[in-house]
Amino acid sequence: MSASDLTSVQAGAPQGRRQILVTSALPYANGQIHIGHLVEYIQTDIWVRTMRMHGHEIYYIGADDTHGTPVMLRAEQEGVSPKQLIERVWREHKRDFDSFGVSFDNFYTTDSDENRVLSETIYLALKEAGFIAEREIEQAYDPVRQMFLPDRFIKGECPKCHAKDQYGDSCEVCGTTYQPTDLIHPYSVVSGAAPVRKTSTHYFFRLSDPRCEAFLREWVSGLAQPEATNKMREWLGEAGEAKLADWDISRDAPYFGFEIPGAPGKYFYVWLDAPVGYYASFKNLCERRGLDFDAWIRKDSTTEQYHFIGKDILYFHTLFWPAMLEFSGHRTPTNVFAHGFLTVDGAKMSKSRGTFITAQSYIDTGLNPEWLRYYFAAKLNATMEDIDLNLEDFQARVNSDLVGKYVNIASRAAGFLLKRFDGRVQASAMNHPLLATLRGAIPQIAAHYEAREYGRALRQTMELADAVNGYVDSAKPWELAKDPANAVALHETCSVSLEAFRLLSLALKPVLPRVAQGVEAFLGIAPLTWADAGMPLSPEQPVRAYQHLMTRVDPKQIDALLAANRGSLQGTAAAAEAGAANGNGAGSKNGKGAKAAAQPAASAANADDGASPIISIDDFAKIDLRIAKIVACQAVEGSDKLLQLTLDVGEERTRNVFSGIKSAYRPEQLVGKLTVMVANLAPRKMKFGLSEGMVLAASAADEKAEPGLYILEPHSGAKPGMRVK
């Protein structure tokens, strides 16, 4: 099936039994699964379950992405071999995916014999077709560790805006991309040594070949997402621009990965063998199940192949990967579906705020994984828009939709049916007009899921749940039960309610698979499929005793979850206690209450010039003070007090802070300075934007008598992200 056929396939009911291969991006094998990762795996799993319910032959394939310098160095830090590290991480990742109901048909590893053979086969086919070039390149080399340094293992001064401590491939301040050799005053993140320049032979995939450009211009027209199509056209440029650059697919030893055939000491770059890992995992499954692997991947295959990814890796999946497949003689993806990023409470995930939430901590805290599946699904659509996990809304939506609207229907009807009617529904009730409405909506809900419009599917489902609850409220079965003369009406009401509950459970099954299993057991029915919409409950099959299917979210669980993920705060507390034990704690030398007033978003609070109240070491340990570098600063339009600071706090992103220090500093005076900030202060929304912390400044108690405002500056040698303790 070609990419352009997708719309016609998704428009209505399934057109015959389709053969579909589906993947999610491979998680890297040097860290934990967090809720940002789970957005993609839950999104993919819902789609896969939808297609399984249509009866299609569909395989959901995954693997750990195991190769590269970061894994090699992480293993070294832990005192284990890379293979030992990736085996342990694989078990952790598999546990997390199982906990959240991510139903891989095979979850494998890229460090496999299948992947080695397939990577070599594809490489040699590309080489035979003239798509591999060999060149001498100059790279940064760590003379201490005697290794070439990947781009992200070099930092230095941006060659364009001169911001300090920028990575070797791009500047997080001005957005410029460049080569590591372009950095000013570079240093190795591994050893701290100044890299030297050294030449080495590398191997390139010739993406600039006119054949690649011609193929990609045609292939991009089939992408389902306009945002992806537009981005690809931007990368391709106009015809004749030749914007595509060749891609370096090799790395030098020492490196954890696959050695390139015929090139001793040279290894495939991880981004070559990682996507091949999709096929390797599927090949492993095919060998175990007796499937014809070649029939699925050969160029003339009529199967479908879909990749679900984050928008940050669109470049690899829509340029390199399809071109590699096309010119090595394999089928190309039917489509690539990209999603946006996850924020928590309107901000990027943060360890200091406890919102960098790992999958395991969510489970350990006792939260139901299907709560998160439902919430993410309610926010997801077919675009690359970012989604936000608002924890208050999460609690309210789960409690209202899933408990108040959905499972409440069964709890209101099951008891009466079991007690009064032996658990058997009334046959004539199955023809009620309300049920006809629900059955008529099921195909549209299924189509929404298939089109990845999960939010629409759930909105429609909850509207139907409202209608069912309205029916129950109007019929008042609790009142009918008081008079034996109302037995027929009571039987009808309970029967309609439970059949409606079955249909709502069918609509929710891709999102809530474990709840659906409980419903199937309760009703005594076979696993639900989309075809079952028109097969109502039968009086021949009594329902069983109702068991609670879902509980409400307790606010204390959310508090516990955030507390469990404040890893940086725990580290600060431990450091503070250690300092106190050595006579260097908070109360040792500065116990006179010297005033270092934190400057909040609007203005500094007035303070007494006497000593502040005595606090315990535990109180002090709650404050996460960090060294911050001011990488940008500007006046705030409409304010005579505020400056807007962009701070590097040693995280993966910069922070935005508004500070009332405009009277003391011009913006250009502050850029490049180090200061101290409160890193775990709750973000504050202002009319100018979101302030994500406070910088510290000193002033006299009587500012009129002693004017002056002075931000705190650490001695040279301090670096962004260091804790103040």
Curated annotation (Swiss-Prot):
Its EC number is 6.1.1.10. A motif ('HIGH' region) lies at residues 27-37. It is found in: Cytoplasm. A motif ('KMSKS' region) lies at residues 348-352. This is Methionine--tRNA ligase. One of its GO terms (molecular function) is methionine-tRNA ligase activity. Residues 619-725 form the tRNA-binding domain. One of its GO terms (biological process) is methionyl-tRNA aminoacylation. Belongs to the class-I aminoacyl-tRNA synthetase family. MetG type 1 subfamily. Keywords: Aminoacyl-tRNA synthetase, ATP-binding, Cytoplasm, Ligase, Metal-binding, Nucleotide-binding, Protein biosynthesis, RNA-binding, tRNA-binding, Zinc. Homodimer. GO terms for cellular component: cytosol. Disulfide bonds: none annotated. Is required not only for elongation of protein synthesis but also for the initiation of all mRNA translation through initiator tRNA(fMet) aminoacylation. It comes from Burkholderia pseudomallei (strain 668). Pfam families: tRNA-synt_1g, tRNA_bind. InterPro entries: aa-tRNA-synth_I_CS, Anticodon_Met, Met-tRNA-synth_bsu_C, Met-tRNA_ligase_1, Met-tRNA_synth, Methionyl/Leucyl_tRNA_Synth, MetRS_core, MetRS_Zn. ATP binds at K351. Binds 1 zinc ion per subunit. Its cofactor is Zn(2+).
